[in-house]
Amino acid sequence: MLREELQKNQELIIAKISKKKLPLTAEEYRKYYKICDALPFAFTDIEMVFNEEKKAVDWIFRYGNEALAALEKQPLDKMIGSSFSSLFSNMDAKWLHVYERATLYGETLEIMDYSPEIDTNLKIICFPTFPGHCGCILFNADQMKSISEENHLVRLVEVSMKNNSSK
């Protein structure tokens, strides 16, 4: 009951400061982010949940694409409208601090860290969307390729081959 009251108060505060029309239903979020449905990387819009001290304590998935569902290893229909902590009991607070900064201070941030919730190394770029929300682009960091790293390996092979041919 207390959590529901906090949520309603939060929505009222956000509505007062918001000049942008906030989507109110899952359908409105789907329509707004339709272009993101087919992205080849995970994307989500999350609504932050704050306590009385205005500290982030959780977030609610308001939109997500199928790539997000695959990365998070959860069905999309189970995620949308659910809080992160209700889906993952081993929630790590490090994500909250980054998303809170993007939401409250309008910062675009990047975090690369291990996610114990899904046992995956992640690269996440988050940015403000609607008041009280942030968007997140997520990548499995172990599946990403670094051009500079590949170029470095090519140079090492070239040097090695050059050294071997001169012997």
Task: List PLM regions with ranges.
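PAS/PAS-like sensory domain cap-loop motif
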Residues: 54-56, 68-79
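Sensory coupling linkers of modular signal transduction proteins
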Residues: 1-22, 130-157
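Terminal output helix/cap of sensory domains in signal transduction proteins
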Residues: 87-114
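Alpha-helical sensory/transduction surfaces in regulatory modules that relay environmental signals to outputs
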Residues: 71, 78-80, 84-87, 102
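PAS/PAC sensory module
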Residues: 42, 108-114, 120-125
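N-terminal capping loop/helix in small sensory signaling domains highlighted by a polar->aromatic N-x2-3-F motif
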Residues: 61-69
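PAS-family sensory domains and related alpha-helical coupling modules
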Residues: 21-40, 149-167
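Short hydrophobic secondary-structure edge segments in sensory/regulatory modules of signaling proteins
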Residues: 43-47, 51, 164-167
